[in-house]
Amino acid sequence: FPVARTFATSELRWDQIVQNLWYTVEGILGVPVDVSVRFIYIFILFGAFLEMSGAGKWFIDLAYSITGTRKGGPAKASVVASGFMGMLSGSSVANTVTTGALTIPLMKRSGYSPEFAGAVESSVSSGGQILPPVMGAAAFLIVEYTGTPFRDVVIAATLPAVAFFFGMWVMVHFEAAKRGIGGLSRSELLDLGSHMRRGWFYLVPLGLLLYYLVIARLSVGRAGWLTIVATVALVAAVAAYNERTSPFLFGGIAAGYALFAASLAATGATPVELLFGAEAVGGPAVTVGAALREATASLPTVVAAVSLVLLLADPRGEAPLLDLDDGVVDAAARVDERTGRDAASSRAGQFGAFVLKAMDSGAKTATIVVVAVVAAGVVPGIIGITGLGGSLRALIISVSGGSLVLLLILAGLAAVIVGMGMPTTVMYIIIVVLLGPVLPEFGIAILAVHLFVLYLGLMADVTPPVMVAAYAAAGIAKSDPFATGKQAFLLSLNKILVPFAFVFSPGILLLRTRDRKSVV
């Protein structure tokens, strides 16, 4: 039995296995857990804060305002909205359920079949994890396994993600043209201009995240924490804002910023440091330009402090722009029932509920991801202690016969099969450990290898018979699950074509020459 001999290993004792899995960095406490603690939790928390702020609802309404009146408008709105939401949630099923509850009924009402409506939603929802800049949890594993800066991963993933979503847009357009499906009437949609004026600030956290990662080139962890602080400060400012308080809000922010910069320029210490005993330095400690840059970096803290003072001074004032997630409003209402207080109608109470609900939601989501990542750490640990990695590599190369195309097909099939019913992070870890060292031997760029695995693994969410995202969409659409999954698989075929394209043409990933030659 040649195959059996290929997987033969030396005899191992249980104490050796336990030692390797639990007390070394090659097992459960290896790279995946390290990444989940340092990076993944931070960005899951950021996604929770942004979603609870009401950004999720705003992005969905924005998608309908932009595309709703076009041919096949509801389906096109689903493509745009699910891309935004999937980028934040990092879960195909959660994204399908969240956005599908709004988009699928509208698609059915406009003339799409229930199966097609569910297929569109599940397909684009599973693709949300490939959309920069957040890209779900797997992006941070790519950073750690490849040693590629996060900004380079974001840049490389942009064109393939655009290609996938553009392909989905084209397919729903052709289906609308075939069925004669038009768009929604303008009276059913929010006015784009007024909608932007009421919620443009939801774009600020994403813009700041890109600035911190791509331009300022901060570490991933610091960029994440600073963006979370900025999101909390933004919601605090929105809660504190109304016509009566706006002069105090903006005046206080300007005064705080000026005081911060002046203190740094004159003493080298911030006002808080001086307040708690930092000694002033004679003469200017930093240049004016450096002081302004430092004050700008600390602007979210100033905004949060001024806004909280106004909220505490007038907790029941109006907040015309505050439109938090329904989960936050419900949580505040439950507090009212239990305590007999009127927190739901208080802007200060709603802000407090927002912070607590976001922390609760982020912690619950992170727990699920971290547990899955810990479990996935068993696989590389076992492969390392048994030495199966080399045997698997030799077997895969032998089966492929040295053909790169056949090797990629085998890798894609493995990613789809392993990914069925599994979180994306677990699938990615297993496939990268098994196949990651093999593909670069054929001259494939390391980043292309890891993005290839991510793309093909996401296909599992819409591939029969498991197709968890398609099942979730079928439940909302009240359609046949298998027919919905079949349609979703066909719609997602460009999720297979795109990774093959950037493997053979690394220029799609905007890789520099030295990056194309990198190996694991």
Which residue stretches match the model-derived regions?
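Membrane-interfacial helical/loop segments at transmembrane boundaries in membrane proteins
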Residues: 3-26, 267-293, 389-398, 403, ...
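Hydrophobic transmembrane alpha-helices
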Residues: 46-49, 84-85, 126-131, 372, ...
